[in-house]
Amino acid sequence: MNYQLITTDAGLQQVCDQAKKHAQIALDTEFVRTRTYYPQLGLIQLYDGEQLSLIDPLPIKQWQPFIELLSNTQVVKFLHAGSEDLEVFLNAFKTLPTPMVDTQILAAFTGRPMSCGFATLVAEYMEVELDKSEARTDWLARPLTEKQCVYAAADVFYLLPMAKRLVQETEEAGWTAAASNECLLLCQRRSETLAPELAYREITNAWQLRPRQLGCLQKLAEWRLRQARERDLAVNFVVREENLWQVARHMPTSLGELDSLGLSGPEIRYHGKTLVALVAEAAELEESALPEPLPNLIDQPGYKKVFKEIKAAIVIASEQSGLSSELLASRRQINQLLNWHWKLKVGDNLPELVSGWRGDLLAAPLQDILKGY
């Protein structure tokens, strides 16, 4: 397996010019994310069927050729389980690969488990056992070892031929349009960014709080998310989620009270005064400015019963279509549908279970069930 390590702008330009001539390329990324909010890009792997390149992002300055390749609609980009890679591209280049085909999604449409691993598919299609010993390596350390480079190169070297076969199988099974729709949905989900003022809704057990406490949590969660993004620090390294909830619940007025709520020394040292000030702001809010209480979906009358009925309808659709129940509907998607039906959460888009390719299979039976609730 021959590869070239790309460390210059001119080298990247040559790789992208060459890749543009191909209808399909395989892409992968290696990144590190331990304490940071954003993934830190350590390596990009690109294989166009002729040339396998390991692109070192640390010395490269001129990314325009790569950004143009990502958005070149004449070149299909294959990724495997690409959700995190999409986040990396979005963060580093403000661009998603278009069009993008995720081979894990193709595998699911050809009868394999929903989260079929890359190594499993490579063993099946290429009859090669991949060495995964470098999976947890530090991709920001330099120089990269030969072992790291071979590991990284294998990810795209086997991905491209395997992807071509999966595309063919998906086509033969009649699911090409649905698989494309699912890949698009993955890109859509990745493009959605959480508005800081709505971050409080994502905090576990936020529904247990009264409006005044919720108003406090809204201020705290917005501040924490903005801090995390500005300082590129994982949210729980700013203030842990359970501690944020405790502050909102008890609305302390002093640093001593923060200590008794169980906040860590560094949390109090760095952010104690800010937290107490935000609590004071929340205490002053007009009643009319407080958020509505958050309904808890699973406490809704009939939740368990309707959930069970929906699951049963999905099993029937799975048997009829030959697609797994996991692919057809996740718990998140069922809850999204019920939140929409009961108007507990307002979104711009129709729920995934009654739109796109899933809607073709599920909308009619699910709407029949929902009429009873």
UniProtKB/Swiss-Prot annotation:
EC number(s) on file: 3.1.13.5
Reactions catalysed, as given in the entry: Exonucleolytic cleavage that removes extra residues from the 3'-terminus of tRNA to produce 5'-mononucleotides
Keyword vocabulary terms for this entry: Cytoplasm, Exonuclease, Hydrolase, Nuclease, tRNA processing
Biological processes, Gene Ontology terms: tRNA 3'-end processing
Catalytic class of the enzyme: hydrolase
InterPro entries, per database record: 3'-5'_exonuclease_dom, HRDC-like_sf, HRDC_dom, HRDC_dom_sf, RNase_D, RNase_D-like, RNAseD_HRDC_C, RNaseH-like_sf
Entry-linked Pfam families: DNA_pol_A_exo1 (PF01612), HRDC (PF00570), RNAseD_HRDC_C (PF21293)
Superkingdom per UniProt: Bacteria
Localisation: Cytoplasm
CC cofactor: a divalent metal cation
Residue span(s) of domain 3'-5' exonuclease: 3-171
Segments forming domain HRDC: 210-289
One GO molecular-function entry: nucleotide binding
GO cellular component assignments: cytoplasm
Family annotation (PANTHER family): RIBONUCLEASE D
HAMAP family attached to this UniProt entry: RNase_D
Family of this protein: Belongs to the RNase D family.
Reported function: Exonuclease involved in the 3' processing of various precursor tRNAs. Initiates hydrolysis at the 3'-terminus of an RNA molecule and releases 5'-mononucleotides.
Name this polypeptide is given: Ribonuclease D
Lineage: Bacteria, Pseudomonadati, Pseudomonadota, Gammaproteobacteria, Enterobacterales
Name of the gene encoding the protein in the UniProt record: rnd
